[in-house]
Amino acid sequence: MGQKINPLGFRLGTTQGHHSIWFAQAKNYSDGLQEDQKIRNCIKNYLQKNMRISSGVEGIARIEIRKRIDLIQVIIYMGFPKLLLEGKTRRIEELQMNVQKELNCVNRKLNIAITRITNPYGHPNILAEFIAGQLKNRVSFRKAIKKAIELTEQADTKGIQVQIAGRLDGKEIARVEWMREGRVPLQTIRAKIDYCSYGVRTVYGVLGIKIWIFWE
């Protein structure tokens, strides 16, 4: 059987970098990981509650966390930063307070920055959110995939592969469907490939979306 490795972990140190940048002693390492997970969940939950928009896309490409002894710096890479910057200072301060409350950090300062990314639909996380929104609105999965592929073509990507698994279009038996456009060389380590795995709850059950995007 084919052994399927995560494309991001496979390329760490060549074309991919870490999303958490800090050091810790072995006994404190698990606490640091849990802290990172809390920060990411808190930011995503805040966006879901406060940024209701028609497309259902939060627009977070990735959240980078850098830690020093007295400072936690969080950089949110967003495709649509207007969602968070409309009431710029108030919203960011509110988000900062929510994260601080969740972490209960007394001795460390928290700093949240937002960076806008170009070509948002060239990032698999944002594209997966778009497809999930379409599936929740009961759009046919084939139509949703084709629309997503059209959006990535505008972002100058060299190839994309989209896979959806589950009870597609409400059918009784779960199955896996996929579509590829262009080249996606998963075996080539130096190929810059972005990957995302995303679960979406629909009226028929949970569907799993996987997206591979080949840049260069």
UniProtKB/Swiss-Prot annotation:
Say yes or no: keyword ATP-binding present.
no
InterPro entries annotated for this entry?
KH_dom-like_a/b, KH_dom_type_2, KH_sf_prok-type, Ribosomal_S3_C_sf, Ribosomal_uS3_bac-typ, Ribosomal_uS3_C, Ribosomal_uS3_CS
Q: Keywords of this protein's UniProt record, alphabetized?
A: Chloroplast, Plastid, Ribonucleoprotein, Ribosomal protein, RNA-binding, rRNA-binding
| UniProt signal peptide | none
**Family annotation (SUPFAM superfamilies):** Prokaryotic type KH domain (KH-domain type II) (SSF54814), Ribosomal protein S3 C-terminal domain (SSF54821)
Q: Where in the cell is it found?
A: Plastid, Chloroplast
List the GO terms this entry assigns under cellular component, sorted alphabetically: chloroplast; cytosolic small ribosomal subunit
CDD domains referenced in this protein's UniProt entry, alphabetically: KH-II_30S_S3
Which cysteines in this chain are paired by disulphide bridges?
none
Q: Name one GO molecular function term.
A: structural constituent of ribosome
PROSITE patterns, per database record: KH_TYPE_2 (PS50823), RIBOSOMAL_S3 (PS00548)
Q: Which biological process, per GO, is one annotated for this protein? A: translation
KH type-2 domain segment(s): 43-118
Return the PANTHER family for the record. Answer: 30S/40S RIBOSOMAL PROTEIN S3, SMALL RIBOSOMAL SUBUNIT PROTEIN US3C
Note the subunit structure.
Part of the 30S ribosomal subunit.
Similarity-based family: Belongs to the universal ribosomal protein uS3 family.
Question: Mind telling me what this protein is named?
Answer: Small ribosomal subunit protein uS3c
